[in-house]
Amino acid sequence: MADGNGTQETQDQAPAINAMVQYTKDFSFENPNAPRSLGPQEKAPNIAIQVHVNAQQLAESDFEVNIVLEGSAGEGANTLFKFELDYAGMFRLLNISPNDMHPVVMIECPRLLFPFARQIIADAVRSGGFPPLYIDPIDFAALYRKRLDEVAASAPQLKS
């Protein structure tokens, strides 16, 4: 209800990101060398992590956004563990300009999902017999800019 100063109307026009639901789409954890891999290690394992962000528009203001986290500790025959998590959420975006929609979907939505995906990985690694793996925070804005640069670099250049 408006209070005479247009407060309700202003609130109705404010940009909003609503997480409607979050869910695990796919998850895999492998501990291929257990129980041998669970003993003391001579040196710290090489940990590799890849991050991918995908999005799909479901309706005019609804988007499904996925973070895919793939990682491993160790290499080759000395692999301690591997994981792959596809964690997603459905977001309703309101009052966001068309120019801002893509960055919001690809930066802000994954930023909201990441802490939950990070905890799933940490819990799985701990349940696999290892100390929990807490993935460092991800700069989704930098990841977005990098992806835009890659797309621009692969696009055919027009000669004038």
Swiss-Prot record:
One of the proteins required for the normal export of preproteins out of the cell cytoplasm. It is a molecular chaperone that binds to a subset of precursor proteins, maintaining them in a translocation-competent state. It also specifically binds to its receptor SecA. Pfam families: SecB (PF02556). It comes from Beijerinckia indica subsp. indica (strain ATCC 9039 / DSM 1715 / NCIMB 8712). It is found in: Cytoplasm. Its main location: cytoplasm. Disulfide bonds: none annotated. Belongs to the SecB family. This is Protein-export protein SecB. GO terms for biological process: protein folding; protein tetramerization; protein transport. Keywords: Chaperone, Cytoplasm, Protein transport, Translocation, Transport. Homotetramer, a dimer of dimers. One homotetramer interacts with 1 SecA dimer. InterPro entries: SecB (IPR003708), SecB-like_sf (IPR035958). GO terms for cellular component: cytoplasm. NCBIfam families: PRK05751.1-3, secB. One of its GO terms (molecular function) is unfolded protein binding.
